[in-house]
Amino acid sequence: MEKCTTGAYNVLVVKENTPKAIKNKIICIGRITIMRLVKKVTAAAMASAMALSLAACGGGSTATTAAPTEAAKETTAASEAATEAAKEAAETAAQAAGTADVADKKVGISIYKFDDNFMTLYRQELQRYLTEDLGFKAENVVIQDGKGDQAEQTNQINNFITQKYDVLILNLVQASSAPEITDMCKDAGIPVVFINREPDEAEEQRWVDEKINATYVGCDARQSGTYQGEEILETETKGDINGDGKVSYVMIQGDPENVDAQYRTEFSVKALTDAGVEVEELLKQRGDWDQAKAQQIAQDALNQYGDKIEVIFCNNDAMALGALQAIEAAGRKVNEDIYLVGVDALTEAVQNVIDGKQTGTVFNDHFSQAKAAADAAVKFIGGEEVDAKIPVDYIKVTNANAQEILDKLK
């Protein structure tokens, strides 16, 4: 990537070998910049036309003159030229940005449930980016609460389809419902962007094979699980606090039917075994991504297994916060006689990492995901091809970088 200078502007020249993630961010920034530039060009053009008109009015022409004066002719021509130039500039920029006429397009969004900590941050950023940066009208961006009920969410999607929304962005209650939902959207001719909860690989391949306008935007949950395991390996004892040659752990899952929960559960432990560490699973139980449920699970586990528990893995930070409450109530201290890891990098969890109350978490970058999902929706509206999967990387969060992540969240 090179920076060139042309007139008063700096121009980034993106080379062919520039990483895709960087290209996407440049395109995203470019869209916003272009639209702002269009406004300036339009305003400047209209101002020039007005100035010329005023000059002509002061040139001595009379109301009784049948034919326009030369000054008036020049004014009219200049005004028309300026208006046409502004119009062409606006159209060109809008097409380049892929955001032509989005203000009148309707985006239907369904979130699996509103009281999920992480998805609250995600939907707030998604709504902000669609309306403030991409130019959708606020009333045309409708976000509904799936209430953790797939039947309820499917009904919402049917309503979006009936009302002829232009594109849907869906955080499914159950990722296994993706084939059914995809077919509903396909039959209605409405493109769909799935977020956060990934359909299985076979479904994503079907989109490619059948040329279906569907995509998944999100992180690879295997990466988040691996990072959790690595955070335990990076501790002084590599998780084996009592020195018995193995890591004894409790696993608090989100929803066992959810792909993210499955991968985080599997790959957090796999990171340990791949490193040659022996493990012992004391308990694995469903916490439904819920803080209160996780607190009860951790409390029961601590009562049953006591000091034998060396690590508590949680599929998300909300459950890690609940587990911490149980740990502290039991008189245990994180990073001294027990380790605790989560996923999402909720503000409170990151602060706990800084304070030594949580061993680590994994930043589920809702900023980048929300922008990538919205950009994909705009491309679909514009008739562009969109990859079946748009990946966004997780970021490991430990005491070494937790303050940096917290500053970003604020």
Predicted regions span which residues?
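Hydrophobic alpha-helical
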Residues: L126, N158, T162, V167-D187, ...
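Hinge/cleft segment of the Venus flytrap/periplasmic-binding protein
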Residues: E84, E88-A89, A94-K105, F114, ...
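Flexible loop/hinge segments that line or gate small-molecule binding clefts
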Residues: I181-Q223, D244-G245, L346-I354, T359
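Short, solvent-exposed amphipathic alpha-helices that sit
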Residues: F118-D133, S224-Q228, V259-E278, I297, ...
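Bacterial lipoprotein signal-peptidase II cleavage site
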Residues: K40, L54-A66
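Extracytoplasmic "Venus flytrap"
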Residues: K106-D133, V141-N159, Q163-Y165, N171-S176, ...
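Hydrophobic alpha-helical segments within soluble ligand-binding/sensing domains
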Residues: A97, D101-V102, V107, Q153, ...
